[in-house]
């Protein structure tokens, strides 16, 4: 966000305690603030499944079990019609869950001087998966500017960006 000269980063997310040495142990309350935007959880809406069609590598599938929690949250937040910009193939609930049971699992290992220190496994969501999340905010002008920035480029969310995790394209629906 700093490369875009976004002046309201603290307003959106709150102050970053780690940026300011004065804020050790939250002692400097004038610099400590909570963000004014609320980002609700991202719910899986559609999942890429291998296509048997020669012209397409994958198709996006969804089901009522994936859509219902999104619709319920939208209703609870007062969002009457959120528009899905893509059409997905509606699958029977059990069939799509079979695909979801087989998410890729990647073994990760921390090496220290060539010696294995810690082996763990991570389940990853395939590229091209579609999620929906909602944002509530207190300032329309700040939100418009923020929204423009997050839709311009890829955004990296969460950890492990150095190994390609968490990169996403955000599109307003």
Question: For each predicted feature, which ranges?
Answer:
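RNA-binding basic/glycine-rich loop and surface signature characteristic of RAMP-family CRISPR effectors
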Residues: 1-173
């Amino acid at each position: 966000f700093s490369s875009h000269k976004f002046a309201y980063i603290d307003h959106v997310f709150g102050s970053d305690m780690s940026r300011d040495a004065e804020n050790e142990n939250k002692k400097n309350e004038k610099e400590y603030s909570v963000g004014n935007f609320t980002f609700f959880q991202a719910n899986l809406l559609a999942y890429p499944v291998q296509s048997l069609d020669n012209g397409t590598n994958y198709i996006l599938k969804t089901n009522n079990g994936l859509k219902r929690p999104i619709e319920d949250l939208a209703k609870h937040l007062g969002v009457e019609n959120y528009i899905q910009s893509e059409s997905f193939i509606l699958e029977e609930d059990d069939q799509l869950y079979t695909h979801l049971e087989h998410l890729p699992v990647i073994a990760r290992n921390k090496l220290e001087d060539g010696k294995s220190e810690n082996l763990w496994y991570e389940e990853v969501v395939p590229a091209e998966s579609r999620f929906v999340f909602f944002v509530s905010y207190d300032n329309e002008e700040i939100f418009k500017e923020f929204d423009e920035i997050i839709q311009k480029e890829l955004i990296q969310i969460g950890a492990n960006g150095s190994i390609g995790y968490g990169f996403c394209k955000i599109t307003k629906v």
